[in-house]
Amino acid sequence: MKLLRVGTAGAERPALLDAEGVLRDLTGIVDDIDGALLADAAALGRVRAAADAGELPALDATGLRIGPPLARIGKVVCIGLNYHDHARETGAEPPAEPVVFFKAADTVVGPNDTVLVPRGSVKTDWEVELAVVIGRTARYVADDEDPLAYVAGYAVAHDVSEREFQIERGGTWDKGKNCETFNPLGPWLVTADEVADPQDLSLKLWVNGELKQDGTTAEQIFSVAEVVRYVSQFMVLYPGDVINTGTPAGVALGAPEPKPFLRAGDVVELEIAGLGRQRQEFKDA
């Protein structure tokens, strides 16, 4: 299923995109798309049954904003330097263990919402990423368990980053990762049963129509399964938590000088095969 939330910011309603591309209203069946729903197999079953039976009313998508596909996100865990080609382009050694950091849940916005270039920024950068959405509480996932059994679904994430704040201003990466609007998510949450292999997904990103990133999750240093298992050894992952699993080569940071960092007026488009497409205009904060 493709689950999404539509409407004005803060007042989104749950919806489903059916196999014919028709937007369907879920408000008569569920209150919202959130961790509680993803953890409730019976509720998800009712959604699927209603969709299969053609019982869901259609919504007019004309002019309708798409919000983040998930409400009340608990935490956004991020994995840095998780693609072989991205590590090569930045001159970094592939890490021996996953590089873990966080983005605040309030950085999450809709897939087509405006992204704000922070005041004083001269090095705002792009990163297309596969987002993993947790559907079951994952705590110390064992070696003999399948970590993907804890995954509810997948989405497109844009891990927007300010490199000067992140790298040059001291401390941890947090300052360059948590600026407002720095995590567009969606358009949909695609349930895990519709993603045959999360290690076989193409990712692309364009800036002002020019292709900048063209990668595949097959290049990940640590697979989705390895990431879920690893992170669960250090923190509990709850339904509705999100893991951004890293970006492939092609970011501005890895480009020759002068590096083409983002400015107000730029337009970024990104997509992951089967998971949908985003488009953001960048404006000054």
Model-derived features: where do they sit?
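Structural signature of FAD isoalloxazine-binding scaffolds in flavoprotein oxidoreductases
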Residues: P94-P111, T124-W126, L262-G274
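RNA pseudouridine synthases
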Residues: I134, A142-A157
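Catalytic-pocket segment enriched in acidic/His residues
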Residues: R5-G10, R48, P57-D60, L64, ...
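A generic local secondary-structure boundary/capping motif
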Residues: L4, I66-P68, R88-G91, V115-T124, ...
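Generic beta-strand structural signal
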Residues: K2, G74-V77, E97-V99, D113-V115, ...
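N-terminal non-catalytic cap/leader segment that marks the start of a structured domain
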Residues: M1-P98, K204, V267-E269
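Short, structured patches in soluble enzyme cores that scaffold and shape functional sites
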Residues: K103-A105, N112, R119, W126-L130, ...
